[in-house]
Design a protein with these regions (language model features):
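Conserved catalytic-core segment of nucleotide-activated headgroup transferases in glycan assembly
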Residues: 1-13, 130-209, 287-294, 305-306, ...
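C-terminal amphipathic helix plus adjacent low-complexity
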Residues: 291-366
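Donor nucleotide-activated moiety binding/catalytic core segment of transferases
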Residues: 39-47, 204-246
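Catalytic donor nucleotide-activated moiety binding site of glycosyltransferases and closely related
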Residues: 17-32, 185-221
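Catalytic binding pocket for nucleotide-activated donors in carbohydrate/polymer assembly enzymes
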Residues: 93, 121, 243-320
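Active-site and donor-binding regions of nucleotide-sugar-utilizing enzymes
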Residues: 1-137
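Redox-cofactor binding/interface segments in oxidoreductases and associated redox assembly factors
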Residues: 56-57, 78, 101, 162, ...
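Short acidic-hydrophobic, aromatic-tinged amphipathic segments that line or gate anion-handling sites
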Residues: 34-40, 219-223, 284-296
Length: 366
């Protein structure tokens, strides 16, 4: 997520400190200015005592959940980690000062939520998707180096990737074995890749479904591996509203079949605005079906994968979503340094020593 930004700052020889709660984070070995801050309450305590001009985080809920606005921080910036709308739990972005987004659609979503909640208008910078850029750079290398085949033999069958979101509105919670059996009845292969949070919050559900599909020749559970394996080796995706839909579309330009149901917006920011823009384009990039269509999945999948998909629409949506493709690290770093320049400028009346830092930033941004 942060790798393209850190690599850009390193190339500019500009100092920063990267903090992580993942003891296995690659940045701890690849970037010298990195620190492991622990997990849980230990990490929250560290973050709540920060002193910095600008703090950039992917975690929503500032001043709502455990992470509070530290007195020593001049500016809080959120970076969106998905190509979809940043539809977090309610108030997820309300108290950030700025946001780095991927597209105009994400910007408009945030503006709608601001108006609905009556909160201060944030600065928004369209800087592209660092996540998508990093994944794009790694995908071919990962697949080539590991050479892992999910299915040893396909025998002419299509591979369907079931990749849902997590929670009560996710496909596995909503439909479970009914959907799995419907896909298998088509005669195709099925790769099930649950959302990582499902393994924590819905562990009993996942354990039950894995037990019920154990030994099925046409089923593979893809857990704990880079998602590019499943995406590259599948022909079509089935999902709900997960952001991985757009990863699949942007990286592989393959069709997506989405299950249409009455989404419960309670507890999410989207409860206070109109329909999410994603739901308006799902029909363009593949096919939208309801539970009563499960018996027709074979016919629908065949049409999508045998030239019946709208490739023109997929390419158009890809262009809208993936702005600044492969340049998000530079765009994001410039926005962050611009924010720091302003924070330092506001302090100049009291602390003249910051002027050298401002001059260095201007030199880098020139």
């Amino acid at each position: 997520m942060f790798a393209p930004i850190l690599e850009t700052l390193d190339s500019w020889d500009y100092p920063y400190i990267f903090l992580t709660s993942d003891s296995a984070d690659p940045a701890l070995t690849h970037h010298k200015q990195s620190k492991f801050i622990g997990t849980g309450n230990r990490a929250y305590a560290y973050l709540n005592g920060l002193s910095a001009d600008v703090v950039v985080m992917t975690t929503p809920g500032l001043d709502v959940l455990q992470i509070k606005r530290a007195r020593g921080v001049g500016h809080y910036c959120h970076i969106v980690h998905s190509l979809a709308s940043p539809n977090y739990r309610v108030f997820g972005l309300d108290y950030y000062d700025s946001v780095l987004v991927n597209s105009v659609m994400q910007e408009e979503f945030i503006r709608q939520v601001e108006r609905a909640h009556g909160v201060k208008r944030k600065e928004i910078f369209i800087t592209g998707s660092t996540y998508c850029d990093a994944l794009c750079a790694r995908k071919e290398r990962i697949v080539a180096q590991e050479g892992r085949e999910i299915f040893a033999s396909r025998e002419g069958r299509k591979a369907v990737l079931l990749s849902p979101s997590w929670g009560k509105e996710g496909l596995l919670s909503k439909f479970g074995m009914r959907l799995i059996e419907a896909v298998l009845s088509t005669g195709h292969l099925l790769i099930i890749r649950p959302h990582p949070q499902s393994l924590i919050s819905e562990s009993l559900l996942i354990e039950d479904l894995r037990a019920r599909t154990e030994g099925m020749e046409a089923v593979r559970w893809d857990i704990g591996t880079p998602n590019v394996h499943a995406m590259s080796q599948s022909d079509v995706m089935i999902s709900d509203f997960s952001g991985i839909i757009f990863d699949y579309l942007c990286l592989y330009e393959k069709p997506v079949l989405t299950i249409d149901f009455d989404f419960d917006h309670a507890g999410y920011d989207s409860a206070d605005i109109g329909e999410l823009w994603e739901f308006g384009i799902f029909g363009e990039i593949g096919k939208r079906v309801r539970e009563e269509d499960f018996g027709r999945l074979g016919e629908i999948i065949a049409k999508l994968t045998d030239g019946g998909g709208n490739q023109e629409a997929i390419s158009r949506v890809r262009e809208l979503l993936w702005t600044h493709a492969r340049d998000s690290g530079v765009q994001s770093a410039r926005a962050i340094l611009g924010l720091r320049e302003r924070v330092l400028g506001e302090r100049l009346g009291r602390l003249k020593g910051y002027s050298d830092e401002i001059l260095k930033i201007r030199e880098v941004l020139a």
